[in-house]
């Protein structure tokens, strides 16, 4: 297969981190745009990105791009794409997409047109008047932005933030991709004492352990393209072997504490599923009263936030108490994510640096001290 262009969508604010990550994986011609990062390569590069990308949401092949001001433009543009290079005669090819600031604004209508064009193209190429779609799934995705269409083939299936270790979560969970981003912002590589004092279901600590080990986050899950006839099985075997060869071994100090015992039980289960249960210590403790576990280290955390007024006031009091507790913890660097716009006021200190991110649709800032 010739060199292809791939697109990795990501949460807003993580584009630069994802770009750096893909470059570290030796992927070629990495290009960063708003909420997505592109690279070029073959199926081996695709498998490596799926297995090893910590902060992207999925890996998609860019099949085509063209302008469309009418449904006929959209139909002809999709019909011209050589879908038969990837989709066999029995392949199932559902369609999902979105449209913004375009003349073709009805997403259901656009999805129907893309589907019709794909059916027409494949029917003609395979000499079939009806396509059974009883085989493996080849998810088509499209975006229409300012009348410019991009057509993609999703190779990941389930979003990459689903690593396969978290089946249960407490309230206000942090996406695994966002947790990995916070650990990367803290520049944690396994040498410092790492502490999440509001660990909840353990996501930040687990992602820290995976990063310390240099363990590929996708080793415990499967991907849509693994079942495709056009992708040799050896591609996936080689990618997994290389990922395992890159792992580190060492002694790490990772602590997750929380005031809620039920959350800690879930955290321990999740850590075991992720294969890092022995690397993380979980402790029941109040973050505003607990003694510092070491003289220096990294604090990376997602304190509780409230959506209703009473919950917001409770969260604000918690930020104040937490700030007072850490007032003299000068040996600790702190990376705290919060959706509270006045977080610095309640915490009692201006951040050295701030970075705007989105946890799903929730606008947040990472406050760095």
Report the location of each language-model feature:
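Non-catalytic nucleic-acid substrate-recognition regions in nucleic-acid-modifying enzymes
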Residues: 2-136
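Short beta-strand/turn micro-motifs composed of small residues
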Residues: 10, 258, 338
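SAM-dependent Rossmann-like transferase core, predominantly class I methyltransferases
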Residues: 151-187
């Amino acid at each position: 297969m010739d060199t292809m262009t791939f697109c990795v969508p990501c949460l807003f604010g993580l584009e630069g981190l994802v770009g750096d990550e893909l470059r570290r994986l030796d992927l070629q011609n990495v290009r960063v745009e708003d909420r997505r990062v592109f690279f070029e390569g073959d199926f081996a590069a695709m498998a490596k990105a799926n297995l090893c990308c910590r902060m992207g949401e999925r890996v998609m092949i860019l099949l085509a791009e063209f302008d469309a001001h009418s449904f006929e433009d959209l139909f002809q543009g999709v019909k011209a794409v050589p879908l038969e290079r990837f989709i066999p005669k029995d392949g199932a090819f559902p369609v999902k997409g979105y449209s913004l600031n375009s003349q073709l604004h009805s997403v259901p209508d656009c999805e129907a047109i893309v589907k019709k064009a794909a059916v027409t193209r494949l029917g003609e190429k395979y000499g079939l008047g009806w396509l059974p779609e009883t085989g493996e799934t080849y998810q088509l995705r499209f975006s229409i932005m300012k009348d410019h269409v991009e057509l993609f083939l999703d190779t990941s299936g389930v979003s990459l933030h689903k690593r396969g270790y978290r089946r249960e979560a407490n309230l206000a969970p942090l996406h695994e991709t966002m947790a990995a981003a916070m650990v990367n912002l803290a520049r944690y590589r396994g040498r410092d004492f790492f502490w999440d004092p509001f660990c909840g279901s353990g996501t930040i600590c687990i992602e820290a352990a995976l990063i310390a080990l240099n363990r590929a986050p996708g080793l415990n899950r499967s991907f849509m393209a693994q079942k495709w006839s056009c992708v040799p099985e050896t591609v996936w075997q080689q990618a997994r072997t290389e990922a395992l060869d890159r792992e580190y071994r060492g002694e790490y100090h990772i602590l997750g504490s929380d005031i809620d015992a039920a959350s800690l039980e879930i955290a321990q289960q999740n850590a075991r599923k992720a294969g890092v249960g022995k690397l993380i210590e979980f402790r029941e403790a109040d973050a505003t009263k607990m003694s510092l576990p070491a003289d220096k280290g990294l604090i990376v955390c997602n304190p509780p936030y409230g959506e209703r007024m009473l919950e917001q006031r409770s969260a604000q009091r918690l930020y104040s108490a937490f700030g007072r507790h850490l007032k003299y913890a000068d040996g600790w660097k702190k990376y705290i994510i919060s959706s509270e716009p006045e977080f610095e006021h309640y915490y009692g200190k201006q951040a050295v640096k701030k970075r705007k991110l989105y946890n799903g649709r929730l606008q947040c800032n990472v406050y760095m001290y």
